[in-house]
Design a protein with these regions (language model features):
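Nudix hydrolase/Nudix homology domain
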Residues: 30-32, 101-158
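Conserved Nudix-box catalytic region and its N-terminal flanking loop in Nudix hydrolases
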Residues: 20-55, 149
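N-terminal strand-loop-strand
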Residues: 1-34, 61, 65
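Short charge-dense sequence patches
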Residues: 1-6, 35-39, 74-82, 153
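Short, well-ordered strand-loop elements centered on a beta-strand within folded domains, enriched
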Residues: 20-23, 95-99, 138-140
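Unchanged
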Residues: 39-62, 72-123
Length: 158
């Protein structure tokens, strides 16, 4: 029996302000990522995305819809990531992101600058195209169904 390799589940959020996108920079490596992280036990993807944005940037958001779902395997195969990226609405569009988590520096970055950044996973052009094609970030997205696992019904008695 083959043992499955671990897959990291990540819930991220796409927050757009004008022609800028919210990203978090890891200063030690100069890698940029969307704000996000892995869900806690019993935490839905939507809740995880909202919590991670708050923890990493200090901003309050409400995820709207699924913008992307992706698989990413690192070039050497040492990491496999499954990521759900939600579009989101800010509670206060004038709030300034602040680094609340060690090792991350959040900021709004111009869409035109995405091509010059080390964004991981490397989806900068897809993000840019999505935002330009869908300014309201609702068109061409999928619905998030949440936790659909219900209780198993008892068998009918004969």
């Amino acid at each position: 029996m083959e043992i499955a390799e671990p897959v990291t589940v990540r819930c991220s959020t796409l927050v757009v302000r004008g022609d800028c996108i919210l990203l978090c920079r890891r200063p030690t490596t100069d890698i940029w990522v969307l704000p996000g992280g892995s869900p806690r036990r019993s935490e839905g993807a939507w809740e995880c995305a909202r919590r991670e944005v708050s923890q990493e940037t200090g901003l309050a958001v409400t995820p709207d819809r699924v913008a992307f779902v992706l698989d990413a395997t690192s070039p050497k195969g040492e990491q496999h990531l499954f990521e759900i990226i939600f579009s989101a609405t800010e509670a206060d569009p004038s709030a300034t992101p602040c680094g609340t988590e060690d090792g991350l520096a959040p900021s709004f970055v111009q869409l035109d600058a995405l091509r010059d950044l080390m964004l991981l996973p490397p989806i900068g052009e897809r993000l840019r195209a999505f935002i330009e094609r869908s300014p309201d970030r609702v068109a061409e997205t999928a619905s998030y169904l949440g936790n659909v696992w219900g209780t198993i019904p008892e068998p009918a008695s004969s």
